[in-house]
UniProtKB/Swiss-Prot annotation:
This is Nuclear polyadenylated RNA-binding protein 4. One of its GO terms (molecular function) is mRNA binding. Methylated by HMT1. The methylation is required for nuclear export. The lineage of its organism: Eukaryota, Fungi, Dikarya, Ascomycota, Saccharomycotina. RNA-binding protein, which is involved in the polyadenylation-dependent pre-mRNA 3'-end formation and cooperates with the cleavage factor CFIA complex and the cleavage and polyadenylation factor (CPF) complex. May be involved in regulation of poly(A) site selection. Is involved in nonsense-mediated mRNA decay. Seems to bind to an RNA downstream sequence element (DSE) located 3' of a nonsense codon and may mark the transcript for decay. GO terms for cellular component: cytoplasm; cytoplasmic stress granule; mRNA cleavage factor complex; nucleus. It is found in: Cytoplasm; Nucleus; Cytoplasm, Stress granule. Residues 1-154, 316-354, 415-534 are annotated as: Disordered. CDD domains: RRM1_Hrp1p, RRM2_Hrp1p. The keyword Membrane does not apply.
């Protein structure tokens, strides 16, 4: 590198890099837009101002640079011819560059404002500052609108309060006098029963300033010997936006103020109510906290148990009463809907409850299809047959009424064949097991349905049922003896045998008077003794 080039770089070397850096910085700032932070923008502005100051300095040094160029050109003339030609070409190029640089500097100086900065660059810089500010507010507005929608707006009734737990004898004058020490009471009303005119135990109160409401909710209040419960009045259209939790397991030494301060870390509290004993003034172990949004409730309910003053307290969501009623009703309806999804339709919820309150169903849950209904009817028949065998009573009429009721409850399902007859399933089961068909004589001796006066007999081919003995009819000695079962030594049978012996004794006496009786009608085989037949 020649000395001329070194001198040129020393004088004008910072000009080109500076201008290129300016263009690059401006392009980067235009591309970055809202993505650059304010700190980066300030740094870019400082760099821009410093570069502009450097641009102004070459204008003042143009004369000195021209003189130096003339000196260098004169020194070059002392060399060889080749050197002169090369130096002349270099000087020509340098002059061209110098003229272009000076023209740019003059243009910048002419376009500079009062402060010495170019208007175009100032406008670009200002636009860079304005773009983030113009874009950031919409994002902030979106987040703010979301929060405003999720939070309850209490500004409509910020001066109104709900007063609960009032004494029956508390009047509006007493209530106004008590709360008048917290501020000017503008409106007050105690709700009364329209029929009796007696107080319903709660009312509403309005102050002139919201600060009075803030003072009231900080402390506990006792009026006419009873602890009252003043709360902020929440508009009906804002109640769904609020969230309430139940807190249990609170220590007896916890005070209302520290209770509220502890739960304020999860959100803005509308009302914090720690239940206190009116006699001792200590905590009763539970309380309620109302937040201005449901998001705060979600945050505090992430853990079921929280440490508070060296104790584990329990956190639950507190639902309003009308929501609890809806959930209970939905639970009952879901039960009916589940049965409907299985293929059946009970018509309404009342029929569903009526069917499951029937003791004959015994927890049996039928599937609503023909095969399941057939199995259900068969199960009902077996149940009534078992009851007949245990009690000795005829349940045919009761069974038919039950079947008719089931037919009315489910009109869409046809009754299976022989559903109204009680004895048919048992006979069919005997036939399928291979037992012989009963004859007329067997039916006279023992039927499947036991009635009063007949003794139940079991077939030797089938295992006997382990059922309790029911009431028995009069003994038939001859039938028992012929069938091989022997004598029945039951006490009830002995009492019946005594009556039978009395009858036989009288009949035997009549035969003796006719000359054909034996021993006065007394039958030794009866093995009994009657006191009136001596």
């Amino acid at each position: 590198m020649s000395s001329d080039e070194e001198d040129f770089n020393d004088i004008y070397g910072d000009d080109k890099p500076t201008t290129t850096e300016e263009v690059k910085k401006e392009e980067e700032q235009n591309k970055a837009g809202s993505g650059t932070s304010q700190l980066d923008q300030l740094a870019a502005l400082q760099a821009l101002s410093s570069s502009l100051n450097k641009l102004n300095n070459p204008n003042s040094n143009n004369s000195s640079s021209n003189n130096s160029n003339q000196d260098t050109s004169s020194s070059k003339q002392d060399g060889t011819a080749n050197d002169k030609e090369g130096s002349n070409e270099d000087t020509k190029n340098e002059k061209k560059q110098e003229s272009a640089t000076s023209a740019n500097a003059n243009a910048n100086a002419s376009s500079a404002g009062p402060s010495g900065l170019p208007w175009e660059q100032l406008q670009q810089t200002m636009s860079q500052f304005q773009q983030p500010s113009s874009q950031s507010p919409p994002q902030q507005q979106v987040t703010q609108t979301k929060e405003e929608r999720s939070k309850a707006d209490l500004s409509k009734e910020s001066c109104k309060m709900f007063i609960g737990g009032l004494n029956w004898d508390t009047t509006e004058d007493n209530l106004r006098e008590y709360f008048g020490k917290y501020g000017t009471v503008t409106d007050l009303k105690i709700m009364k029963d329209p029929a009796t005119g007696r107080s319903r135990g709660f009312g509403f109160l309005s102050f002139e300033k919201p600060s009075s409401v803030d003072e009231v909710v900080k402390t506990q209040h006792i009026l006419d010997g009873k602890v009252i419960d003043p709360k902020r009045a929440i508009p009906r259209d804002e109640q769904d936006k609020t969230g309430k939790i139940f807190v249990g397991g609170i220590g007896p030494d916890v005070r209302p103020k520290e209770f509220e301060e502890f739960f304020s870390q999860w959100g803005t509290i509308i009302d914090a109510q720690l239940m206190l004993d009116k006699d001792t003034g200590q905590s009763r172990g539970f309380g309620f906290v109302t937040y201005d949004s449901a998001d705060a409730v979600d945050r505090v309910c992430q853990n079921k148990f929280i440490d508070f003053k060296d104790r584990k307290i329990e956190i639950k969501r507190a639902e309003p009463r009308h929501m609890q009623q809806k959930s209970s009703n939905n639970g009952g309806n879901n039960g009916g809907n589940n049965m409907n999804r299985r293929g059946g339709n009970f018509g309404n919820q009342g029929d569903f409850n009526q069917m499951y309150q029937n003791p004959m169903m015994g927890g049996y849950n039928p599937m609503m299809n023909p095969q399941a209904m057939t199995d259900y009817y068969q199960k009902m028949q077996e149940y009534y047959q078992q009851m007949q065998k245990q009690t000795g009573m005829d349940y045919t009429q009761m069974y038919q009424q039950q079947m008719q009721q089931m037919a009315m409850m489910m009109p869409g399902f046809a009754m299976p064949p022989n559903a109204m007859t009680l004895n048919q399933p048992q006979q069919d089961s005997n036939a399928t097991q291979g037992s012989p068909a009963p004859s007329d004589s067997d039916n006279n001796k023992s039927n499947d349905v036991q009635t009063i006066g007949n003794t139940s007999n079991t077939d030797s081919g089938s295992p006997p049922l382990n059922l309790p003995n029911g009431p028995k009819g009069p003994s038939q000695y001859n039938d028992d003896h012929n069938s091989g079962y022997g004598y029945n030594r039951d006490r009830g049978d002995r009492d019946r045998n005594d009556r039978d012996r009395d009858y036989n004794h009288r009949s035997g006496g009549n035969h003796r008077r006719n000359g054909r009786g034996g021993r006065g009608g007394y039958n030794r085989r009866n093995n009994g003794y009657h006191p009136y037949n001596r």
